[in-house]
Regions:
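Conserved beta-strand-loop-beta-strand element in the redox core of flavoprotein oxidoreductases
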Residues: 148-172
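Short beta-strand to alpha-helix junction loop
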Residues: 64-65, 112-131, 142
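N-terminal Rossmann-like FAD-binding beta1-loop-alpha1 element of flavoenzymes
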Residues: 2-43
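A conserved beta-strand/loop element that lines the FAD pocket in flavoprotein oxidoreductases
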Residues: 133-148
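Flavin (FAD/FMN) cofactor-binding and adjacent substrate-gating region
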Residues: 83-124, 152-157
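N-terminal FAD cofactor-binding segment of flavoenzymes
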Residues: 22-26, 40-99
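Conserved, well-structured functional cores that handle cations and Mg-NTP chemistry
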Residues: 55, 122, 126-133, 149, ...
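Conserved aromatic-histidine-acidic binding/catalytic patches
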Residues: 11, 15, 57, 61, ...
Length: 172
């Protein structure tokens, strides 16, 4: 990828928000399209009860980021990790899951830090990720916009995606 590119991300779920953060960094314009309305302006608690996301069928379930993603957030986005923890997500380390007998003989290892899980309600994880992404340079959200297909071309045996077909207010 080159600087000054414009990247379209279809969906503002956890994967789409993660992609926007990975592709961003201030050198590219990132537009995140989502068929659902934006989250409420209030707290993560309010979002749990009022945010409607047709595109996220497991919205009100608990979710966990496994060790690798938790480590990536901790190392690359420490401010995001601090916000996630401040808003109620919890870290669960290897030692936290040991029963009494194993816990007594357990000797921590430096690499145990990379085994921690980050867990919370999905609404909390998405809300904080989204607010963090929205503050990054060049990131824009377009809500109530359903992606209906790709605008693509072939050149020299290669496929190039030039855009997306988007539906808004019943018009593609």
């Amino acid at each position: 990828m080159r600087a000054n590119e414009h990247i379209l991300v279809a969906g503002s779920g956890i994967a789409g928000l993660g992609a926007a953060l990975a592709f961003g960094g201030g050198t590219r314009r990132i537009t995140i399209l989502d068929r659902d309305p934006p989250p409420p302006a209030g707290s993560a608690e309010e979002a749990f009860y009022s945010w409607e996301r047709r595109g996220a069928t497991q919205l009100r379930h608990s979710h966990a980021f496994l060790g690798r993603l938790t480590t990536l957030i901790r190392e690359r986005y420490p401010d995001l990790m601090a916000e996630l923890l401040h808003e109620g997500t919890r870290l669960f380390g290897f030692a936290d899951g040991l029963n009494g007998t194993l816990a007594q003989s357990y000797v921590p290892s430096k690499s145990d830090e990379d085994l921690k899980l980050l867990f919370s309600r999905r609404t909390t994880l998405e809300l904080i990720l989204r607010r963090y992404a929205a503050r990054q340079p060049g990131v824009t959200f377009i809500n109530d916009a359903g992606v209906r297909g790709l605008i693509a071309r072939r050149e020299g045996g290669k496929l190039f995606v030039d855009g997306l077909k988007v539906e808004r207010n019943g018009v593609v």
